Amino acid sequence: MQADQVLKLVRLSEKSNKLSSELGQYTFEVFKGTNKHQIAEAVEQTFKVTVKRVNVQNYRGKNKKSRTGRPSVGSDYKKAIVTLKAGDKIELV
């Protein structure tokens, strides 16, 4: 698979910034149908680094209400936490 068919975006938050600076772990939102091997290959091809481990979490969309009171559901998504080999780093702007 192409890297753009696997990786959607980089998730930046306080927790993900702490993981990247202390443990060398980076957080990505990925497409639902991808597996750990495809995610590792896409990160290695895109950022020219060596992936040590990939952890994946599936999230269900939250229940919400619109202005008119109608119930709706947010989008489901899949998150991947990628651990890099010691010494490797991804420069995120």
Swiss-Prot record:
- UniProt key word RNA-binding: yes
- What is the role of the protein in this entry? One of the early assembly proteins it binds 23S rRNA. One of the proteins that surrounds the polypeptide exit tunnel on the outside of the ribosome. Forms the main docking site for trigger factor binding to the ribosome.
Its protein name is Large ribosomal subunit protein uL23
Annotated GO biological processes are: translation
The protein's UniProt keywords, in alphabetical order, are: Ribonucleoprotein, Ribosomal protein, RNA-binding, rRNA-binding
Q: Which GO terms describe its molecular function?
A: rRNA binding; structural constituent of ribosome
Return the similarity comment.
Belongs to the universal ribosomal protein uL23 family.
Q: What do the Gene Ontology cellular component annotations say?
A: ribonucleoprotein complex; ribosome
Q: Which HAMAP family would you find in this protein's record?
A: Ribosomal_uL23_B (MF_01369_B)
Please name the InterPro entries in this protein's record.
Answer: Nucleotide-bd_a/b_plait_sf (IPR012677), Ribosomal_uL23-like (IPR013025), Ribosomal_uL23/eL15/eS24_sf (IPR012678), Ribosomal_uL23_CS (IPR001014)
Please give the organism: Opitutus terrae (strain DSM 11246 / JCM 15787 / PB90-1)
Q: Which PROSITE patterns match?
A: RIBOSOMAL_L23
Subunit comment? Part of the 50S ribosomal subunit. Contacts protein L29, and trigger factor when it is bound to the ribosome.
